[in-house]
């Protein structure tokens, strides 16, 4: 039985954000690197470093936290895994869901690589809906 790498990184980021950790370490694969590039480009994380330990590559993500008047920190990231190994969810470009009226993003795996919902609509291409981020 294989591991769900995308669910692992989503869970790691969500847990680190709820625990107010500044950095989180995830395994480095092509899929995780592409998803992290999207998170960095969209401003959900501050920084990414590649780290190598005994033949294994890791990505160290620096999370972004927002300060609030009442509490010192507010959970900033909300991530939800949509398509999973037991139930794949596919969508054409016209039916890609909009999260919070376009405020959030949908990460989609297409034949041209992993991209956001906006990029997929511009290129008029559909694919597997991996996760929602808002």
From Swiss-Prot:
Chief place of localization: plastid
Keyword Ribosomal protein included in the entry's annotation: yes
Gene Ontology molecular-function annotations: rRNA binding; structural constituent of ribosome
Cited function: One of the primary rRNA binding proteins, it binds directly to 16S rRNA central domain where it helps coordinate assembly of the platform of the 30S subunit.
PROSITE patterns noted in UniProt: RIBOSOMAL_S8 (PS00053)
Record flagged with keyword Cell division: no
InterPro entries cross-referenced by the UniProt entry: Ribosomal_uS8, Ribosomal_uS8_CS, Ribosomal_uS8_sf
Keyword terms: Chloroplast, Plastid, Ribonucleoprotein, Ribosomal protein, RNA-binding, rRNA-binding
Intracellular or extracellular location(s): Plastid, Chloroplast
Record protein name field: Small ribosomal subunit protein uS8c
Family: Belongs to the universal ribosomal protein uS8 family.
Subunit annotation: Part of the 30S ribosomal subunit.
Gene Ontology cellular component annotations, sorted alphabetically: chloroplast; ribonucleoprotein complex; ribosome
HAMAP family named among the record's database cross-references: Ribosomal_uS8_B (MF_01302_B)
UniProt record, GO biological process: translation
């Amino acid at each position: 039985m294989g591991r769900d790498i995308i669910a692992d990184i989503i869970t790691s980021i969500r847990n680190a954000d709820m625990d107010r950790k500044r950095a989180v370490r995830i395994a480095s694969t092509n899929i995780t690197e592409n998803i992290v590039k999207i998170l960095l480009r969209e401003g959900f994380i501050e920084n990414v470093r590649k780290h190598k330990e005994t033949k294994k590559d890791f990505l160290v993500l620096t999370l972004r936290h927002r300060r609030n008047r009442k509490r010192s920190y507010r959970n900033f990231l909300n991530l939800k895994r949509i398509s999973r190994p037991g139930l794949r969810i596919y969508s054409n470009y016209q039916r890609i869901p909009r999260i919070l009226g376009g405020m959030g993003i949908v990460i989609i795996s297409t034949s041209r690589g992993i991209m956001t919902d906006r990029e997929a609509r511009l290129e008029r291409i559909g694919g597997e809906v991996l996760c929602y981020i808002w």
